[in-house]
Amino acid sequence: MTIKLSEMESNVSLRSQVFAVLLVVAACPLATQAADWPTARGNAARTGAVENSAGPKSGRVLWVHKSTDHYIAAPVPAGDLVLVSSLAAFNTSSFQALSIDPAAGAKRARWSKAVPYLKLPTVSAPAVFGNLVVFGDGMHQTDGAILHGVRLDTGLPLWQYPVPGQLVHMEGSPAIANGRVLIGGGNAGVVCLDPGKLELNGKEVDAAQAQVILDAQWKELQTKYEREKKIDPDFAIPPSEDSLPKPKPKLVWQSGAGKWHVDSSVAVTGDRVILTSAFLDVEKTGDRSIIGLKLADGSEAWKTPLKHNPWAGPTIAGDLVLVGCSSVRLEPRDLPKAQGEVVAVSLTDGSVKWRNEIPAGVVSAIAVKDGIAVFTATDGCVRAWDVASGKERWKSDPAAPFFASPAVADGMVYVADLKGLVQGMKLSDGKQVWALNLATDSAVQAPGMVYGGPVIAAGRLYVATCNLESPTKVATAVVCIGDK
């Protein structure tokens, strides 16, 4: 693993330190200090865990949040909250900050975003840095997308960055590093922004100035609403966040627009940005490859072609980049014909160090811990390989197919499959320690598929389900598992 959060913090530039100060100054303090989650799965090794966190030793359910929404993206822990994006009715979007307090009950949602503020479906797991939450919107069926920056403490908007275009969507997680925000945008390639410099009403302002303006206007809207309620409560319309000005971050660079198709999350390590691009067979667009860019200007440093599409995105493991590939997308009906491979390339020049084919697709990120690469596949197996050589350490018995990434922490691996079975396994040999069936467990009773990988924070495991493929309306759930 090249880039633990502590290593990132020790190597950030002065600019990123100023950026962090701006975020703190621009926002009210949180009740609980949140651990940053600045990229997909929490870090470039894609462990799905807050640094130095341990997961649960048993499958005890602490709380369940039932819903009719479909949770495709993984949950994201953020201090005393867990953030979830979902598809609501008619493919509308929902984004919620849920309290992790087991006693929260019906008041679990601390704040939420929906229409009219969110205009496109959202399947992007957010990134969190200080009081800034960043997530994208749009799916394969939509054109054009918006990158959103909102406040963690209140959910109020900070900024938006729209990217128009056909087959443009932001499905992967953003990455926040060195004072920059980066995200893949489908046919828009990769976009790199400076969220410390915003355009508002034709003028450049910093993040703190923009928030002062937004707070003042939000207060005016609330005051007007309270005044109208006193005059005629039946016709008073609550204020909408969509009525606020929309500051726009400064574009630093954009690479690969019209050449690449970037649906997965990017990884940032040192002065490099690593991304994976797919080739869309139906639309005949994109480039099936792993690509290394220079963080400073987005110029291409190297490119490595691939046999299958790299839906899993990149994982950084020391001086290697690991990528899982699949011949099929996240479509259950296509699973019988899935083929795939894992490819390890040099972080420096993209040269292939090893590659192994498997009779299944790898559609979610590989997790790396203690020199071991752990990944799930559509054949229902969890595999652990040696990072340096690619040799197999262990493989679990086949069960239900997997779309979701594993989470790894403190000698344990946590996985969840398309039948809603959550397992805790030993990292050393893959032996099962505990299992929880979300469909049959008396505390949950919510059958569903898990698309977004489970995540770990402060001894707890969070997992969310979707039922897009269910012929009947079945409740979905966000589930918190922990020993206490």
Say what each PLM segment does.
Residues T2-A20:
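Bacterial N-terminal signal peptides that target proteins for export
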